[in-house]
């Protein structure tokens, strides 16, 4: 389980957020651009540090201002897929997926087995030796997700995970992403601006407004609050 209670002063407002996500659960964050959604992910992953607060993942404390604990990002074992994720264009699909394992000095036979399994699960085996520059947006997205999941993270953070995927392929990719998250059995937080992503991915939905949790609940509960201006416009598209 992930539990966070963090405060960080931003340029226009103070972000003050408390959230929890259970194992196997997907929490989707929505809100206006600049509301603090991606900042929440960056605070959790360790890219940014809170001014104060606590972040715990399972039995581990990742950050505690009171206890002066701040685990480096590379030691948090979090899979963070950015909106503008970057693959290595000069590498093949398999080499991209293996990159993090090589950085961890995992033995080569273990890398080969883990990469092969991840490619199978993401339907990428036939593309293992293809340079990623030749792939479609949906295929590149699957490679990026495979690269995150092969490290067996304890938490998955996805920022606009389908933004680079062709509209015609998004439905199938959304179902595939949902299946992979469920199979991993870890907490997951997704940031999106798309209603279809909410309906296809969210177990719980959270509206962030100027760095605060405005409302949280099931997708039906939150999307039913049409008196909220953002919710109304979000549903109407």
Task: Show the residue positions of the predicted features.
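Catalytic Walker B motif of ABC-type/P-loop ATPase nucleotide-binding domains
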Residues: 156-160
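Conserved ABC ATPase "signature" region
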Residues: 60-65, 102, 109-127, 178-179
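Conserved ABC ATPase signature
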Residues: 131-135, 139
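A short, proline-enriched helix->beta-strand linker immediately N-terminal to the Walker B motif
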Residues: 150-154
């Amino acid at each position: 389980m992930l539990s966070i209670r963090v405060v960080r002063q931003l340029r226009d407002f103070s972000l003050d957020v408390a959230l929890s996500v259970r194992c196997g659960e997907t929490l989707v964050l929505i809100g206006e651009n600049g509301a603090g959604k991606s900042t929440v992910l960056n605070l959790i992953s360790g890219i940014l540090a809170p001014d104060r607060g606590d972040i715990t993942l399972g039995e581990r404390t990742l950050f505690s201002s009171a206890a002066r604990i701040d685990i480096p990002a590379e030691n948090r074992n979090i899979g963070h897929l950015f909106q503008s994720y970057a693959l290595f264009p000069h590498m093949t699909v398999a080499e991209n997926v293996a990159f993090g394992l090589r950085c961890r000095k995992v033995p080569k036979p273990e890398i080969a087995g883990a990469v092969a399994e991840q490619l199978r699960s993401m339907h990428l085996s036939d593309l293992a030796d293809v340079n990623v520059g030749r792939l479609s947006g949906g295929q590149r997205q699957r490679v990026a997700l495979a690269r995150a999941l092969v490290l067996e993270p304890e938490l998955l953070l996805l920022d606009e995970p389908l933004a680079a995927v062709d509209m015609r392929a998004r439905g199938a990719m959304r179902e595939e992403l949902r299946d992979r998250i469920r199979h991993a059995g870890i907490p997951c937080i997704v940031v999106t601006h798309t209603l279809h992503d909410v309906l296809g991915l969210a177990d719980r939905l959270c509206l962030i407004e100027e760095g605060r949790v405005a409302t949280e609940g099931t997708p039906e509960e939150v999307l039913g609050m049409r008196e909220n201006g953002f919710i109304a416009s979000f549903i109407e598209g």
